[in-house]
């Protein structure tokens, strides 16, 4: 098995095409096959080098390794070779309509209730019409056998059929000499022996046309898999939705773990449960294209965030310590295991370091100020450790006649500035006695600890 992921470098990778890449990769790896990365950059006016690098960076970050990679812009001679062959065979023909003329034809056919299929007028041009087009650069179409039925067994959609008479002869070369998507894609799939083509359902009509090109070139037609499109905020996801929220680089920047994204994207739209996975081995071993369905899929950042929290809260110190160094964070193993259950991303450890070592803002009720002052008076005159803090909290509870909650909440606010977090007896030693005393003093007087 050989699959390929073929992005156009006209934007940064988003969750929609990342899902396609992941499924191509999982399918290949589950069958001990190969995964190819093909950069579809034949449209030089829209392709940018920064997007090529961005695609590779995102795939690398997601640990979706490829067995080979190439850019279509390096294979133009090969496309020309096949183009010339088909031109000599009369399968490709030149056309001279302007875009305005084509738009007018399309509009007229739609008004007549007819499918907007190209009328092949370029094949019927008189000598006078040819002279009228003198000086115009031609574009080229590939002639399809319109008497045939195009059928394939899609691994998600089942049997799919098209009547070729309802399909326009595809434009394969523009007036400026550049190729459209259709033609180079098929040439590459043949030359690189692609066995399975996995992509979004918006390519179904393209597949019908491309099967015709495979047949014209007398090549074996690959297996096709068309996945339902991912929706985001009621819009189909594409590189032009205009929201950074769906870009992989954005998810990386806000602290999402690669495995959270992969755990989510690999199972969404399947009959399998979406669960956090520690590594992708389980995803590879459990992958089965038959579990995918045709129902629309809605992307939820909240769902990924929940998976992310569960994954982060299971990370060992060995897996995060180098990241702390890279981020300039001084986080010990003991501190990580203390606050781990209270973070949603690895970066959140910075907040807890700041709580322990920086200024905090508190909002203590007036009714609790006397209580805070009395609690401070009970603090032992010794360095804090977990046992000392437990004994202190127990003594406060006994002398104040307050419930555990009414003891802990104001003390937590006074010493940390937040209402939730790790056990107070375990956290206070990291703040240190002198700072705890200062914060209690400020809180008892209604001041911020700054």
Swiss-Prot record:
EC number: 6.1.1.17
Keyword field: Aminoacyl-tRNA synthetase, ATP-binding, Cytoplasm, Ligase, Nucleotide-binding, Protein biosynthesis
Motif 'HIGH' region, residue numbers: 7-17
Molecular function GO terms recorded: ATP binding; glutamate-tRNA ligase activity; tRNA binding
UniProt similarity note: Belongs to the class-I aminoacyl-tRNA synthetase family. Glutamate--tRNA ligase type 1 subfamily.
Pfam families (alphabetical): Anticodon_2, tRNA-synt_1c
Gene designation per UniProt: gltX1
Species for this entry: Anaplasma phagocytophilum (strain HZ)
Enzyme class: ligase
Domain of life: Bacteria
A single BP term in Gene Ontology: glutamyl-tRNA aminoacylation
Name this protein carries in UniProt: Glutamate--tRNA ligase 1
Chief subcellular location: cytoplasm
Gene Ontology CC terms: cytoplasm
Keyword Protein biosynthesis in annotation: yes
Binding site for ATP: 239
Purpose: Catalyzes the attachment of glutamate to tRNA(Glu) in a two-step reaction: glutamate is first activated by ATP to form Glu-AMP and then transferred to the acceptor end of tRNA(Glu).
Subcellular location: Cytoplasm
């Amino acid at each position: 098995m050989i699959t390929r992921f073929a992005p156009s470098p006209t934007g940064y990778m988003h969750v929609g095409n990342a899902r396609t890449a992941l499924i191509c990769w999982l399918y290949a790896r589950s069958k001990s096959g190969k995964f190819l990365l093909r950069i579809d950059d034949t449209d030089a006016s829209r392709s940018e080098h920064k997007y090529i690098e961005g695609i590779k960076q995102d795939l690398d970050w997601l640990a979706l390794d490829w067995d080979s990679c190439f850019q279509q812009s390096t294979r133009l001679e090969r496309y020309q070779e096949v183009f010339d062959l088909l031109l000599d065979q009369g399968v490709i023909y030149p056309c001279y309509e302007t875009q305005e003329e084509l738009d007018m034809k399309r509009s007229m056919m739609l008004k007549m209730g007819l499918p907007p299929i190209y009328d092949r007028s370029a094949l019927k041009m008189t000598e006078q019409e040819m002279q009228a087009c003198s000086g115009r650069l031609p574009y080229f179409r590939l002639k399809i056998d319109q008497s045939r039925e195009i059928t394939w067994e899609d691994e998600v959609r089942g049997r799919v059929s098209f009547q070729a008479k309802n399909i326009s002869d595809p434009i394969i070369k523009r007036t400026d000499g550049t190729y459209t998507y259709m033609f180079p894609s098929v040439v590459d799939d043949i030359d690189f022996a692609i066995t399975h083509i996995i992509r979004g359902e918006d390519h179904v009509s393209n597949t019908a046309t491309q099967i015709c090109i495979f047949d014209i070139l007398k090549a074996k037609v690959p297996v096709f898999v068309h996945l339902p499109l991912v929706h985001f905020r009621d819009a189909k996801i594409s590189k032009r939705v205009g929201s950074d929220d769906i870009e992989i680089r954005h998810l990386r920047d806000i602290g999402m773990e690669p495995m959270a994204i992969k755990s989510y994207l690999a199972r969404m739209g399947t009959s399998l449960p979406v669960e956090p996975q520690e590594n992708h081995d389980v995803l590879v071993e459990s992958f089965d294209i038959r579990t995918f369905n045709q129902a629309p899929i809605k992307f939820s950042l909240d769902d990924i965030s929940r998976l992310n929290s569960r994954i982060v809260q299971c990370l060992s110190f060995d897996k995060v310590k180098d990241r702390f160094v890279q981020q300039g964070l001084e986080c010990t193993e003991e501190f990580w295991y203390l606050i781990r259950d209270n973070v949603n991303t690895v970066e959140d450890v910075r907040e807890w370091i700041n709580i322990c070592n920086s200024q905090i803002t508190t909002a203590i009720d007036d009714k609790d100020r006397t209580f805070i002052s009395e609690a401070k008076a009970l603090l032992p005159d010794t360095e804090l450790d977990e046992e000392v803090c437990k004994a202190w909290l127990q003594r406060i509870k006994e002398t104040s006649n307050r419930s555990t909650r009414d003891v802990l909440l104001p003390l937590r606010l006074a010493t940390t500035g937040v209402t939730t977090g790790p056990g107070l007896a375990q956290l206070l030693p990291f703040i240190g006695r002198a700072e705890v005393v200062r914060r209690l003093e400020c809180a008892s007087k209604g001041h911020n600890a700054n």
